[in-house]
Amino acid sequence: MMKKNNSAKRGPQDGNQQPAPPEKVGWVRKFCGKGIFREIWKNRYVVLKGDQLYISEKEVKDEKNIQEVFDLSDYEKCEELRKSKSRSKKNHSKFTLAHSKQPGNTAPNLIFLAVSPEEKESWINALNSAITRAKNRILDEVTVEEDSYLAHPTRDRAKIQHSRRPPTRGHLMAVASTSTSDGMLTLDLIQEEDPSPEEPTSCAESFRVDLDKSVAQLAGSRRRADSDRIQPSADRASSLSRPWEKTDKGATYTPQAPKKLTPTEKGRCASLEEILSQRDAASARTLQLRAEEPPTPALPNPGQLSRIQDLVARKLEETQELLAEVQGLGDGKRKAKDPPRSPPDSESEQLLLETERLLGEASSNWSQAKRVLQEVRELRDLYRQMDLQTPDSHLRQTTPHSQYRKSLM
C-alpha cells in the first residue's frame, strides 16, 4: 500500500521542529531589462532554500516576507551565459536559470551576474542540485510500508551443491567394450564437491564397486575367448617334438597369462601340417585349372607340314630363277647401248626394273615363309616333349611330399 509522506510538503512546520537552514544566500546582480543606452542590472538578495528561490531588494531574515518566490521544479537547468565577442569582465560572471519547455509553464528566465567567476560556479552548482531535488520531489514523497515489500522468490533460497550425475550402465558398457586394456578401467565421471558424511560417499562407493565388477567380468570373458582361439594351434604345435626345446625335469614352471596376438603374428604361428596341406591344396588347384583350360589348337599333321614346306621351297626356286633371268637380260641391254651414262628413258627398261623389284620382294617373302614353317616344326616337337614329361614329373613331385608327411606323423 502506497501513501504520501506529509513531511516533505511546504507550509508551516511544527513548533518543536526548527526550520532547515538555507543552502545558499548572497548578493547578486539581477538583469531587469534594457534601457535606452545600456542594460539594467540591480542588486538583489537571493536565498536558496529547499526547492524555492527567494529574491529580495534588501536582506531579510524571514523568507515569508519576500515577495519574489520561484519554484525550481519549473526550471530545467542553470548554466553559464557568455557572449563570444564580448571582452567585458561581466561576461565571465553571468549565469542564467532556464525554465523548462513544458506546456503551461509561465516561469520567466532569470539572468544573474555574480561578484566573481568562482561565485558564479558556486551558484550554478547549488541551483542545479536544487533543480534535481525539485524534480525528484514527487518520488521522495512516496513511501512503502515494510509489510508491503515484494517477496523475492530466490533471494532466501537455500544454495544446493549441484554435482555431475553418474553415468548410466549402458554408457559404462559402451566405454568398456571400446577399451583396449584388460586391466582396470578408471572413469573419473563423479565430481565430489563437499560431500556429506553419509549419502554421497556411499553412493560413490557403490558406483565404483559396480564398475569394478563389470570390468572384471568383461576382462575374464575376453581372456577365455583369446585362450579358446589360440588353443588349437598350440595343441598342433606341441604334437611335434623338438629336442632343443626340452627343459630340465627339476625346473619349476610358472604359468603366465596368454598374450594377445595381432593378425600378422597369428599368421606366423601356423603349424607345419597346415603349411603342407595348403601346398597340396595349391597343387591340386593348379591341376584342376589345367584340366579346365580349353584345348590348344591342333597343330598340322607332319604330312601337311612337309607338303607346305615343299611348295614354298619350289616357289622360292622359281622366283629366284626368274629374278636371275631378268637381271641377266637387263645387264645385256645396258652393255649393248653406246652411251653408257644415258638414263633409262625407254619403257622397256622401266618395265625390267619394276619386274626385278617385284621378283626381289617375292623372293624375300618366300624366304620368310620358309623360316616360319621351320619354327612351327620346332614348336610341335617341343610340345610333344612337354606332354611326355608332365605325368612323370607330377608323380615325382607328389611322392616325396607324401613320404615326408608320413615320416613326420
From Swiss-Prot:
Q: What GO biological process terms does the UniProt entry carry, in alphabetical order?
A: lamellipodium morphogenesis; myoblast fusion; myoblast migration; regulation of cell shape; regulation of myoblast fusion
Q: Where is this region: Disordered?
A: 1-24, 218-267, 325-350, 390-409
Give site residues, Interacts with capping protein.
155, 157
Q: Where is the composition biased (Basic and acidic residues)?
A: 331-340
Interaction with ATM, CKIP, IFP35 and NMI as annotated region, ranges: 136-308
Q: Where is the protein situated, by its record's location annotation?
A: Cell membrane; Nucleus; Cytoplasm
UniProt xrefs under InterPro entries: PH-like_dom_sf (IPR011993), PH_domain (IPR001849), PKHO1/2 (IPR043448)
What are the residue boundaries of the PH domain, all occurrences included? 21-132
Region annotation Interaction with capping proteins (CPs): where it falls in the sequence:
133-193
Q: Where are the residues marked Cleavage as a site?
A: 310-311, 345-346
What membrane topology is given?
A: Peripheral membrane protein
PTM text = C-terminal fragments could be released during apoptosis via caspase-3-dependent cleavage.
Residues bearing Phosphoserine are: 227, 271, 342
Q: Name one Pfam family in it.
A: PH
Cysteine disulfide partners in this protein? none
One cellular component GO annotation, for this chain's record? nucleus
| Effect ascribed to mutating residue 155 to A | No change in cell morphology and actin cytoskeleton. Great loss of binding to capping proteins. Great loss of binding to capping proteins
Q: What UniProt keywords apply to this chain's record, in alphabetical order?
A: Cell membrane, Cytoplasm, Membrane, Nucleus, Phosphoprotein, Tumor suppressor
- Mutating residue 135 to E has which effect? No effect on binding to capping proteins
**Statement: the UniProt record of this protein carries the keyword Phosphoprotein:** yes
Subunit organization = Heterodimer or homodimer. Interacts with CK2 and actin capping subunits (capping protein CP-alpha and CP-beta). CKIP1 and CK2 together inhibit the activity of actin capping protein at the barbed ends of actin filaments. Interacts with ATM, IFP35, JUN, JUND, NMI and PI3K. Interacts with AKT1, AKT2 and AKT3 (each isozyme of PKB), PtdIns(3,5)P2, PtdIns(4,5)P2 and PtdIns(3,4,5)P2.
Give the protein name, as stated in the record. Answer: Pleckstrin homology domain-containing family O member 1
